[in-house]
Amino acid sequence: MADGITYGIIFPFRQSVTGKYLALSEETNEEIRSNLIFLLLTRKGSRYYLPDFGTRLYEYIFEPLDGETFDSIKTEIQDSVDKYIPNLTIQNITIEPYVDSEPSLGELPSEQFDIPVYRVPGANTEEYTAKVKIEYTDNTNAFGSREFVIINI
């Protein structure tokens, strides 16, 4: 584009103001945030010409939520960002496990739904996940503003 502004598609995808096209980012911080989310949620090996692009976060879904797994997740994120988003500096990665205290679909009476609700006998009803908070600085910003992204795995 001739005006010197770089444009990128905002992730997660949404419609533009006119509703005809995908929304584009015109601000650097918005574009970097979209690029970071896109990088984190892309599985390694899913891009034909860039097989190393992305992360292996999906592989950690059923791993134990302990320090060793958290260190592996941090390393995975840091290595991918260093390689594919060089204008971003990660300040801190915080990972914390939590248990969803809301009732799961299997605990609710099936009369409330039009579809049958199934429950696996003997299965644990608590769903364990981890919350990953990534604090980063945009190196292209003259003021060095800090931003963060939170994803759940």
What are these regions (language model features)?
Residues 1-75, 79, 91-92, 96-153:
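Immediate N-terminus of the mature polypeptide
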